[in-house]
Amino acid sequence: MAHKKAGGSSRNGRDSEGRRLGVKKFGGEIVVSGNIILRQRGTKYHPGANVGLGKDHTIFATTPGNVKFHKGFRGRMFVSVVAEA
């Protein structure tokens, strides 16, 4: 009876894929309406002028222009789009 019994499987060996979050367009970059500026979980960055906030807290441009990151009320980080002059 020199047989091997069934070996147990490892409890490890699984990991979720990355969610591709983060800044997609950096400060000073030119964007057009509808461009995604950043993807986030929660509002680490808040929407400023000429940007919208999606239901998954994605910040996107509503008008063409340049991306601007700035601090505002209570130290919050805001993202705006400044129209090109």
UniProtKB/Swiss-Prot annotation:
Q: Where is this region: Disordered?
A: 1-21
UniProt feature coiled coil, ranges: none
Keyword hit for Cell inner membrane = no
Query: Which Gene3D superfamilies does the UniProt record give?
Result: 2.40.50.100
Write out the GO biological process terms: translation
- Any matching Pfam family: Ribosomal_L27
InterPro entries membership = Ribosomal_bL27, Ribosomal_bL27_CS
- Example of a GO cellular component annotation carried by this entry: cytosolic large ribosomal subunit
Keywords in alphabetical order: Ribonucleoprotein, Ribosomal protein
Q: Which GO terms describe its molecular function?
A: structural constituent of ribosome
Q: Which family does it belong to?
A: Belongs to the bacterial ribosomal protein bL27 family.
HAMAP family, per this entry?
Ribosomal_bL27
Protein name in UniProt: Large ribosomal subunit protein bL27
Gene transcribed to yield this protein: rpmA
